[in-house]
Amino acid sequence: MVIGGGLTGCEIAYDLYLQGKEPVIVEMQNDLIAVKGVCLANSSFLRDFFNANKVPVHLETKLSEIMEDGVMVTDKEGNTFKIDADNVILSIGYNPAPLVEKGKHIHVIGDAKKVGNLRTVIWGAWDVAMKL
């Protein structure tokens, strides 16, 4: 059971499937990997892979409770139901802490600044390095 259908959650579910597990994805948004800046080839591949391999994906569904033998979730119509699971992996978003205000020698880069990809992280690090 993977709670969170962002890039990390989808990559975890993909890896679990390749290991012979039976992952289930629960995502609050109306699509998997619903964030800008992610490589279209990667996100399209993962969506197509889950569809072709019949990996259960519950979109617009919220986690209500984690239990010993599964989770309770609520869909967009307000229906609450149980999904059996041996393990639950939380791959959910978070609100970043504003470090910039806490020190003058702090440079926020990468996903801490804005979700992107390896190229945007490297460019951001290069920009900061050139200013030092």
Task: State each model region's role.
Residues E101-G103:
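Rossmann-fold NAD(P) dinucleotide-binding segment
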Residues M1, I83-A85, V108:
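A residue-level detector for conformationally permissive "hinge/kink" positions
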Residues G9-L16, V35-N42, H107-L132:
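A conserved FAD-binding loop/helix module that cradles the flavin
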Residues L18-L99:
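A Rossmann-like FAD-binding core segment of flavoenzymes
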Residues P23, I106-H107:
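Hydrophobic anchor at the start of a short beta-strand
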